[in-house]
Amino acid sequence: MKTYTFGTLMDGSEVNAYTLESDHISVNILNYGGILQKFLVNGTDIVCGYDSPVDYQNSAGYQGAIIGRYANRIRQGSFSLDDGTVYQLAKNENSTTHLHGGTSGFDQKLWKAAPFSDNGCEGLSLFYISPDGEEGYPGTVCAQVTYKLSGKQFSIR
């Protein structure tokens, strides 16, 4: 596995890229948002990725990123639990809707990276702890995403 500095965010934070490789496949994963930045099959890139972290920050899309805490829209940016507690979330779509985790969702976080290799399989696990109250959500969430490449098989879990 190759690891290199992909670039810096607008606040100066460093973003790293991790390259998983097999005979015909090469995959670049960023620790920023868990973004699948490049996916080469026999030398042809099959994803729409950018060449710098700032391009991802300036994009209105979520290209290749981990989405969360919630993927999709929450109308009026609020929800309630069975006990009647109402939670107001960040509204980041037309000032009325909570979209894909809010103004600073999982796609915009620097994740802790743990590369690994095992019996011809290269992999990368990313970890992020979303604290209670982040983007208005209750409770702490410990998130993990694992990417694996073995021969022609690539998986994300």
At which residue positions do the language-model features occur?
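Surface-exposed acidic/polar loop and edge beta-strand patches at domain peripheries
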Residues: 1-157
